[in-house]
A protein has these predicted regions:
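Structural motif corresponding to the early beta-alpha repeats
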Residues: 28, 32-120, 170, 224-229, ...
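Histidine-acidic metal/acid-base catalytic patches
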Residues: 1-4, 11-26, 53, 57-60, ...
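Active-site acidic/histidine proton-transfer and metal-coordination neighborhood
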Residues: 16-17, 58-59, 74-164, 173, ...
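Conserved phosphate-coordination/catalytic loops
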Residues: 9, 43-47, 79-83, 116, ...
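Surface-exposed loop and edge beta-strand positions of immunoglobulin-like domains
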Residues: 6-8, 139
Length: 283
């Protein structure tokens, strides 16, 4: 396996510091949060992008993905959405990152309408992304939290420049088992975001292995050589433990899981309070 972590866990941290932490703790990659609060985002000047790329290369760390906030299934005109997608693609290309994360964001819309928006926009933007050596990844999130929902869109898009990002928290919260998520996402998958929490009611981030998410079952499905990216949501939970002190423990936990490639026999969904159990599927 290859391991990365998201800079969402290091709000506002300079690129050099994030790269040094990754190298020090054995992570090959970083997922960069592309927001104006952070050092790198779509409005960052070209010279700063070049400097960041050189800093990362000197540390031996690659940019796995650029985590953007474009909502491809949301209502509204296509023009601003497509322009924002192109800006993220250019940022990723400048940083030599293979992926750009996008959100669905279709909450409040009928499912068919949200799907249609996402399909139309991803179809339009995917060739541009592919031409820059980048792939747009629709995250399992908000209006499309399951592998089934993301795949429903991506099956219709049908282009190499669009794929999926499996956020294991949201598929679990939606009641989807890891095997079900993998079945639907595997043909489209870019990489997997892992994390851990205490329960479905308490989403404060924990170090990997300290919570209830079925990370053993998730990693059992990911093929050798795939990327696992730890998204520790410190930005949204400022009272959570600082990430740097957890990086070694988190990576060691993923390494242990990756060495055991078989899922536990007889594992089934339990209550949200049970280790590894998923919340009951909504009616």
């Amino acid at each position: 396996m290859k391991y990365a972590f998201s800079t969402l866990g290091l709000p506002g941290t300079p690129v050099a510091r994030s790269a040094a932490l990754a190298a020090e703790h054995g992570y090959e990659g970083l997922e960069l949060r592309a927001h104006t609060e952070e050092p790198l985002h779509p409005d960052t000047p070209g010279g700063e992008r070049v400097a960041a790329r050189r800093t990362l290369a000197a540390a031996g760390v690659t940019v796995l993905g650029v985590a953007g906030y474009v909502e491809v299934a949301a209502s509204g005109d296509d023009g601003p959405v497509l322009a924002a997608l192109r800006s993220l693609v250019r940022l990723a290309a400048d940083l030599e990152a293979p992926y750009v994360r996008v959100f669905p964001g279709g909450g409040g819309l009928p499912e068919a309408d949200a799907d249609a928006h996402a399909v139309r926009r991803l179809r339009a933007a995917a060739p541009y992304a592919e031409g820059h050596g980048v792939r747009l990844l629709l995250e399992t999130h908000d209006s499309h939290p399951t592998g089934a929902a993301a795949a429903r869109v991506l099956d219709r898009v049908g282009q190499a420049g669009a794929g999926a990002l499996w956020d294991v928290l949201h598929t679990w919260l939606a009641g989807e088992q890891p095997g079900e998520s993998w079945r639907d996402l595997a043909p489209h998958l870019g990489y997997v975001q892992v994390k851990d929490v205490a329960s479905a009611q308490d989403l404060t981030p924990l170090t990997l292995g300290a919570g209830v998410l079925p990370l053993d079952e998730v990693t059992a499905h990911v093929p050798s050589g795939g990327w696992l990216c730890w998204e520790y949501e410190k930005r949204w939970y400022p009272g959570a433990e600082e990430l740097p002190g957890q990086l070694t423990r988190g990576r060691e936990h993923l390494v242990r899981l990756s060495r055991d490639r078989s899922a536990p026999a007889g594992r089934s969904a339990g209550s949200p309070g049970e280790p590894g159990g998923a919340p009951p599927r909504p009616p």
